[in-house]
C-alpha cells in the first residue's frame, strides 16, 4: 500500500511539474517575437494596466497564437496516445490514417482550383489576400480529412477492425492523397502553388480567437471522452482477448478511439497546417515517466504536447529573422531524431 501511495505521489508531482512548465513556457512565449517585451511590459499588458501597441500585440497576436499552441499540442499528443494504444503500434501517430495528407489535399484543392481563402486579382503574389475568407481552405481541409477517416474506418469494419489493416489502409490512402496533391500542384499557377505550399506549413500565426474556440471544443470533448475510457485502454494493453474477457467491446473501442483521435487531428490541421511528430514524441516520453496507466498518461500527454508546441513556437520565432519559421519544421527537426532512436531501441529489444 505504501508503494502504491508513493507511486501516486510521484505521478502527481510529475503532472504538477508539467503544468508549471507549461505556465512558464506560455509566459516566455508571450515575451518573444519581432517586438521584444520585458517582463513588466508583458504583465502590464496582460493585466490591462497599459494600452497602446504592447496591449494590441499581446491580445491581438500573441494570445491567439499561445492558445493555439496549448490546444493543438494537447490534441495532437492525446491523439497519438489513443492511436498507439488502439492499434498496438508504438509508431502510430495522428498521420497514421492519412488525416494530414487528406487535409493538405483539401486545402490545395480550395486554394488552387477555387482560390479559396484568397482574392485572386492577377498573377502577382501581392494580389492574393489571405484575409478574404480564411475559413474556405480550412473547411475543405477538414471535410476531406473527415471523409478519409470515415472511408478507412468503414473499410476496416469489413476486416473485423484488425489493427494491421487500419495501418496499411491509412498508408495506402495517404499515398493516394499525396499523389492527388502533387497533380494539383503540377497544374497550379506560380502564385497558387506558392499559396498552397505556404498553407501546408504548420503555422500558429494564422490562429484567431474563433479558430481557437473551435479547436478547444473539439480537443476538450475528445480528451474528456478519452479520460472516461481510460480503464478500457488499460485493459486493452493486456491484449484484445484479455480485454474482451473483462467486458470491453474491443472493435467498438478501437472505432471510437480512432475516430476521436482523427477528428481532433483534422480540426487542428485544418486550421494550422501540418504539425508533425507531436503525437509520437510526447506519448512515448510520458510512458517512460509515468508508465502505461491511461489515468495518468492522458492528462500528462496533453500537458507535454502543449509544452512541446509552446517551446517549438518560441524557438521558431527566436530563430526567424523578422518572421517566424514554420513551427511544423521545428517539431519535425526535434521529432525525427527521437523517431530514429525509438526505431533502434525497438530493434535492440527484439533481438534480445
Annotated model-derived regions:
Residues 1-352:
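Alpha-helical transmembrane segments in inner-membrane proteins
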Amino acid at each position: 500500500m505504501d508503494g502504491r501511495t508513493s507511486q501516486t505521489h510521484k505521478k502527481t508531482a510529475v503532472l504538477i511539474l508539467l503544468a508549471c512548465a507549461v505556465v512558464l513556457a506560455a509566459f516566455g512565449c508571450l515575451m518573444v517575437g519581432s517586438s521584444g517585451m520585458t517582463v513588466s511590459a508583458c504583465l502590464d499588458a496582460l493585466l490591462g494596466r497599459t494600452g497602446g501597441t504592447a496591449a494590441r500585440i499581446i491580445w491581438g497576436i500573441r494570445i491567439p497564437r499561445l492558445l493555439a499552441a496549448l490546444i493543438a499540442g494537447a490534441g495532437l499528443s492525446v491523439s497519438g496516445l489513443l492511436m498507439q494504444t488502439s492499434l498496438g503500434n508504438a509508431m502510430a501517430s495522428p498521420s497514421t490514417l492519412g488525416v494530414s495528407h487528406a487535409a493538405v489535399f483539401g486545402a490545395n484543392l480550395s486554394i488552387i482550383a477555387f482560390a479559396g481563402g484568397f482574392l485572386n486579382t492577377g498573377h502577382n503574389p501581392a494580389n492574393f489576400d489571405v484575409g478574404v475568407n480564411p475559413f474556405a481552405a480550412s473547411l475543405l481541409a477538414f471535410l476531406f480529412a473527415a471523409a478519409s477517416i470515415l472511408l478507412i474506418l468503414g473499410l476496416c469494419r469489413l476486416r473485423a477492425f484488425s489493427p494491421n489493416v487500419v495501418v496499411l489502409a491509412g498508408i495506402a490512402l495517404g499515398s493516394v492523397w499525396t499523389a492527388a496533391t502533387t497533380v494539383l500542384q503540377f497544374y497550379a499557377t506560380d502564385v497558387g502553388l506558392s499559396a498552397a505550399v505556404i498553407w501546408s506549413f504548420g503555422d500558429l500565426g494564422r490562429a484567431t480567437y474563433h479558430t481557437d474556440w473551435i479547436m478547444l471544443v473539439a480537443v476538450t470533448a475528445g480528451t474528456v471522452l478519452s479520460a472516461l475510457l481510460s480503464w478500457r485502454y488499460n485493459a486493452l494493453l493486456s491484449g484484445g482477448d484479455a480485454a474482451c474477457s473483462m467486458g470491453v467491446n474491443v472493435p467498438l473501442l478501437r472505432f471510437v478511439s480512432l475516430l476521436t483521435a482523427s477528428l481532433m487531428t483534422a480540426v487542428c490541421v485544418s486550421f494550422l497546417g501540418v504539425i508533425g511528430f507531436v503525437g509520437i514524441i510526447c506519448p512515448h516520453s510520458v510512458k517512460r515517466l509515468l508508465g502505461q496507466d491511461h489515468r495518468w498518461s492522458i492528462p500528462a500527454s496533453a500537458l507535454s504536447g502543449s509544452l512541446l508546441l509552446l517551446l517549438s513556437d518560441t524557438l521558431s520565432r527566436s530563430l526567424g529573422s523578422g518572421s517566424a519559421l514554420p513551427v511544423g519544421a521545428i517539431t519535425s527537426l526535434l521529432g525525427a531524431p527521437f523517431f530514429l532512436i525509438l526505431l533502434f531501441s525497438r530493434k535492440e529489444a527484439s533481438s534480445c
